[in-house]
Amino acid sequence: MKHLQEILETTHKLILAGIGNVLKHDDAVGVYMTDNVMPTSIIHPLTVELSIENYIGKINQLNPDTLILVDCVHFNRKPGYTNLIPIKQLIDHTTHTHNISLNKLNQFFRMPVYVLGIQPQDVSFGEGMTPAVKTCADHLLSLINTCSYARTIAGH
């Protein structure tokens, strides 16, 4: 997650948007992360669940340097595999778990948009993430919170 760390160390204002359905096991990972990330002057968590299109105006009004959408993404890898990729690459190379057209969504934002994708194990109906995905999310939260807190203490 070197690329994520570089973004966290250089951006001045980042929105972390959590996408997902909390009633479909690992699909809740984006919501879990934005519910548990530490808000700072740099990191602004936004839980959008299944309706990111309803937050386009708010995100643009907040005018972040960078937008990271956190969601489960089918990379055809082992559960918990993580990749941070520009949204345009995601469209070309992976299958997204929702019906949102990411290509169309990208056109509404003025800032660079990335997807922090986490490979799910189970997106069937039910609550609670699988251990592999929760462990991955907790590791990412630790990285994000540590970098953000260190920069906030240092005054950016």
Language-model segments: residues:
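N-terminal catalytic or cofactor-binding beta/alpha core of small enzyme domains
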Residues: 1-121, 127-156
